[in-house]
Amino acid sequence: MALKIRLARAGSKKRPYYHVVVADVRAPRDGRFIETVGSWNPVLPKDAERVKLDAERIQHWIAQGAQPTDRVLRFLDQAGIAKRPSRNNPTKGEPGKKAQERLALAKQAEEEAAAKAAEAAAAAAAPAEEAASE
């Protein structure tokens, strides 16, 4: 039986409240669970009352093979119960391939326009110099 430590939604409409539960992965999100090991109230400001966790029981279930979900793992990392691996995605902020192609084309067109403008300026200055030297 595969176990997850995950969030089960409670609370009313537009007023979310979550229980941190240990449940079988096949069980419905808000349905059957094995044990409640904490709670999270996202409506509260960021303080100690916002996330409540039973560290001893969570460590017990992790030792039994329960896997925390991403959001729960964030809470466990903040509480110092479990370590969340850091993510490294250095290309996240870069534009996509097509956007990079468009930027390269725009830069090339800009360079060509600048070269033509410089060439035209040089051509315009050249006849004036010839007239002055005669």
From Swiss-Prot:
An annotated GO BP: translation
Region called Disordered, residue ranges: 79-134
Alphabetic keyword roster: Ribonucleoprotein, Ribosomal protein
Keyword Cytoplasm belongs to the record: no
Key word Zinc-finger present: no
HAMAP family: Ribosomal_bS16
A single Gene Ontology CC term: cytoplasm
PANTHER family: 30S RIBOSOMAL PROTEIN S16, SMALL RIBOSOMAL SUBUNIT PROTEIN BS16M
Gene Ontology molecular function: structural constituent of ribosome
Record-given protein name: Small ribosomal subunit protein bS16
SUPFAM superfamilies linked: Ribosomal protein S16 (SSF54565)
Biased composition, class Low complexity, residue ranges: 115-134
Family to which this protein belongs: Belongs to the bacterial ribosomal protein bS16 family.
Coiled coil (residue ranges): none
Cited NCBIfam families: S16
